[in-house]
């Protein structure tokens, strides 16, 4: 659902909602009702099944979509690394997308624009888990200078993060014969990621218990941007009037992210009278530890983070005049996109979806569906700014078709993420990550 995950709303790849790694597959309201969209023929096919758009009736179709995501993300640091909890409940109030299809005879032209990945922002109160873990690592390092040295994490400001991968896809679909069609197009991607926050530490260089006061403050402020171009290929096969099979392949998109960021360490206090030499030695050690930490390092330097290729296959079957069954699967080639270690330790991700449409009458249709997402992430990949968690998604929706030229959808989905715990290079558990999302989708489609 992810295409995945997301980097979700920043701290989540994957996923702001669902998907694998930096992918978001929810591109319209109908997806929330039943995510098995690849085998359907409709305006949504501009994204999910482009080759299927040529099986629409002749005309110009425009579909407008809005998503509202109520997200709760939580990081619980293990006791030996600080034991604090950090939570973000900042919603993504409006995530829009649009699909346009022009069908003429045996050919159609399609366009989709929306958030292909990322999908929002997060705000963690009292910093993030990495600040505590870094504090413990600094503590261990300073004890190498003197066993009496101690470091205490005093807390942090609200950490703001955001991640948006804006995608525009357009192309052409062509019928080869009455049952088979092919499609091809280009995808343009622009990525924007931001992170800023503050951490405060007390350094006790005597080892004695003292009144906690800030004497080191660390500020990070970073923005990373990049763009890339990829392709999309697809086919649609309709062996009977009741059965439809759709296929889509999206190529890997090369994204070179340019970093505009800085890490500032502000020193206050007298450091227990240890003098300027010791102060500078300690502060330099703090700077070095922070800049070397994976969560911080990626925000301070240019990097290549490609969007993985993905392949999708789906089937829709009209069981009766009222009931249509749906199923589809997505596969993400994450390991192939690991050009410079950005997806180190990841496995490939996949999703399996099922759904059903039940037509009450000519105007009203009920929809329901389920999806399981395996993001390919694990305890060796989770970090504060990128934790793609496996998930179960349950969705329902209703479609209203007042006439042949208009269609409206309201949908709801609940995403139940499986908790994940990160381990460091020594095999010690550091942080447990949790997520929960409630999503509402609205769409309006018009035929001209």
Task: Place the predicted regions along the sequence by residue.
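Residue-level signature of outer-membrane beta-barrel architecture
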Residues: 54, 102-104, 174, 233, ...
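N-terminal, post-signal peptide beta-strand-biased segments of exported outer-membrane/organellar beta-barrel
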Residues: 16-121, 387
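Structural signature of outer-membrane beta-barrel domains
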Residues: 69-73, 114-120, 189-194, 250-256, ...
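Outer-membrane beta-barrel "beta-signal"
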Residues: 400-402, 435-448
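Solvent-exposed loop segments that connect transmembrane elements
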Residues: 125-155, 192-222, 257-300, 337, ...
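Residues that define the transmembrane beta-barrel architecture of outer-membrane proteins
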Residues: 44, 91-96, 164-168, 225-231, ...
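Transmembrane beta-barrel strands of outer-membrane/channel proteins
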Residues: 62-70, 111-115, 184-188, 247-251, ...
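Repeated loop/turn-to-beta-strand initiation elements of outer-membrane beta-barrel proteins
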Residues: 60, 106-109, 179-182, 242-245, ...
């Amino acid at each position: 659902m992810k295409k995945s995950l997301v980097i979700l709303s920043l701290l989540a790849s994957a996923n702001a909602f669902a998907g694998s790694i930096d992918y978001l597959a929810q591109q319209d309201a109908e997806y929330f009702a039943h995510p098995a969209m690849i085998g359907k023929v409709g305006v949504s096919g501009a994204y999910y099944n482009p080759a299927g758009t040529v099986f629409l009736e002749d005309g110009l179709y425009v579909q407008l979509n809005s998503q509202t995501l109520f997200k709760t993300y939580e990081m619980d640091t293990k006791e030996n690394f600080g034991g604090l909890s950090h939570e973000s409940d900042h919603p993504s109030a409006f995530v829009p997308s649009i699909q346009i299809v022009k069908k003429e005879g045996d050919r159609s032209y399609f366009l989709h624009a929306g958030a292909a990945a990322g999908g929002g922002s997060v705000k963690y109160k009292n910093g993030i888990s990495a600040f505590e873990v870094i504090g413990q690592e600094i503590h261990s390092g300073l004890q190498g200078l003197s066993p009496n040295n101690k470091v205490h994490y005093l807390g942090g400001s609200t950490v703001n993060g955001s991640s948006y991968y804006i995608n525009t896809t357009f192309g052409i679909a062509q019928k080869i014969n009455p049952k088979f069609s092919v499609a091809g197009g280009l995808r343009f991607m622009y990525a924007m990621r931001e992170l800023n926050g503050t951490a405060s530490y007390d350094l006790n260089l005597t080892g004695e218990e003292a009144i906690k006061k800030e004497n080191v403050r660390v500020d990070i402020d970073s923005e990373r941007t990049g763009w890339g171009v990829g392709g999309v290929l697809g086919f649609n096969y309709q062996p009977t009037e009741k059965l439809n099979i759709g296929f889509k392949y999206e190529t890997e998109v090369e994204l070179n992210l340019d970093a505009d960021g800085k890490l500032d360490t502000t020193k206050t206090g007298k450091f227990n009278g240890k003098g300027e030499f010791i102060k500078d030695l300690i502060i330099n050690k703090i700077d070095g530890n922070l800049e070397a930490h994976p969560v911080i390092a990626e925000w301070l330097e240019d990097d290549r983070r490609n969007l993985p290729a993905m392949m999708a296959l789906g089937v829709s079957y009209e069981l009766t005049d009222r009931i249509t069954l749906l199923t589809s699967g997505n596969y993400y080639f994450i390991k192939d996109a690991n050009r410079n270690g950005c997806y180190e330790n990841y496995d490939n991700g996949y999703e399996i979806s099922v759904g059903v449409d039940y037509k009450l009458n000519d105007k009203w249709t009920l929809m329901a569906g389920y999806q399981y997402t395996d993001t390919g992430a694990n305890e060796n990949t989770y970090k504060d700014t990128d934790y793609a968690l496996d998930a179960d998604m349950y969705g329902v929706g209703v479609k209203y078709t007042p006439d042949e030229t208009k269609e409206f959808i309201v949908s709801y989905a609940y995403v139940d993420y499986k908790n994940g715990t990160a381990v460091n290079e020594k095999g010690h558990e550091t942080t447990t990550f949790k997520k929960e999302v409630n999503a509402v989708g609205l769409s309006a489609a018009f035929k001209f």
